[in-house]
Amino acid sequence: MLGIGKKFPNYSLTGVVSNDQAKAFQNFDANTHKGKWRVVFFWPKDFTFVCPTEIAAFGKLEKEFKARDAQLLGVSSDSEYVHLAWRSTKDELKNLPFPMLSDIKRELSSALGVLDAEAGVAQRATYIVDPQGVIRFAYVTDLSVGRNPQEVLRGLDALQTDELCPCNWKKGEDTLKAA
């Protein structure tokens, strides 16, 4: 798995940004959000059980991420057409405020080292990428375990302080001073 301090790989992926088929698809690459923080999270498959709970939870926090100049990008190995069908039929995904990217060739998940070879899908990986394109946070759970988007937001807050942040630190609390 590509880790902290490494450059996030280049990518060129098609994403679903709307339920209106005429405006549904948009291309995204590593330069699309250049100069911004990115939160890139992977889920294994569309039309499953744990995945929509995570995606919807990230969607509910999108304004919080945006307020921190961070772009959410959700990714799976399903095609953009499968993403559109799922998004159009699953109530909690219908109005997602961030793109659902298709890594159908599994190039990005492979480059990051988060492709589960046995299952043929991406692991539940989350990356926070700084404005220079460097990985600053990496978090992976088992395929059966959903992650906590609130913790990802806390991690972003901590990274953006550029200070020492203790366990369970929250935005607005004191950071540590090295003595």
Regions found by a protein language model. Give the residues of each.
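Chalcogenol-based redox active-site neighborhoods
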Residues: M1-A179
